[in-house]
Swiss-Prot record:
Residues 1-11, 138-161 are lumenal. The gene is GET1. It comes from Lodderomyces elongisporus (strain ATCC 11503 / CBS 2605 / JCM 1781 / NBRC 1676 / NRRL YB-4239) (Yeast). It holds the Pfam family CHD5. Disulfide bonds: none annotated. This is Golgi to ER traffic protein 1. One of its GO terms (cellular component) is Golgi membrane. GO terms for molecular function: protein-membrane adaptor activity. It is a multi-pass membrane protein. Keywords: Coiled coil, Endoplasmic reticulum, ER-Golgi transport, Golgi apparatus, Membrane, Transmembrane, Transmembrane helix, Transport. It is found in: Endoplasmic reticulum membrane; Golgi apparatus membrane.
Length: 204
């Protein structure tokens, strides 16, 4: 099969960056990324009138809500009620517009999901197919046990050589452990389970 003669340093850096981005996407979550892309699309890129109206009405709701919080319902009841009715009307209109643009959101979400998959998987498969026989690193003979040198060289190289398969395995392991160490202090503490007390048997 065809292989490409690419500089090993380029392969090392490229594969590391792609795997790092994969881990970052996993940490953030595809759904959050889709939400961010949708927000950018609706705010800056879309030419849909429904989306423009949706954004305007959302802004109106935000402004009216601020006004309502500054008014006392007891002291200025009429004004407060008027704003409240306007808010109810706007929320109903926003709900209707949201149903209208739901199809477009589904389309953008699908495109975003496909783009993420292609960006993160195609380069890796390209490297695996066309650079699989490129030696990336060399280990001085005898520095490791012979069986370990042989294992690290799998599946295409002689002992003492590190290829893409081994490099990607190591990078994935290091990144996973690094993410765990960074995120562990911020994880929610699990309460220690309380052992139930055995009910004392009452003498009959």
């Amino acid at each position: 099969m065809l292989t490409l003669d690419i500089d090993p340093y380029t392969i090392l850096v490229t594969s590391f960056l792609i795997l790092a981005i994969q881990k970052l996407v996993t940490v953030i979550g595809k759904q959050k990324i889709q939400l961010y892309i949708w927000q950018i699309y609706t705010k800056y890129l879309s030419h849909s009138q429904s989306i423009k109206q949706f954004n305007l009405k959302q802004k109106e709701i935000k402004d009216l809500t601020k006004q309502q919080k500054l008014i006392s319902a007891q002291d200025e009841y009429a004004k407060w009620t008027k704003i409240n009715r306007a808010l109810d009307k706007l929320k109903l209109e926003v709900q209707e517009l949201n149903e209208t643009i739901a199809g477009e959101k589904t389309r953008i979400d699908s495109i975003t999901k496909l783009a993420i998959t292609l960006i993160l998987t195609l380069p890796i498969w390209f490297l695996r197919i066309f650079c699989r026989k490129t030696a990336l690193l060399y280990i001085r003979k005898g520095i490791l046990p012979a069986y370990l040198e042989w294992w690290l060289a799998l599946p295409f190289f002689k002992s003492g050589t590190i290829g893409l398969t081994c490099w990607m395995f190591v990078v994935n392991s290091v990144l996973s452990n690094l993410i765990f160490l960074i995120s562990f202090p911020f994880t929610q503490k699990v309460e220690r389970p309380i052992k139930p007390k055995n009910e004392q048997k009452t003498e009959s």
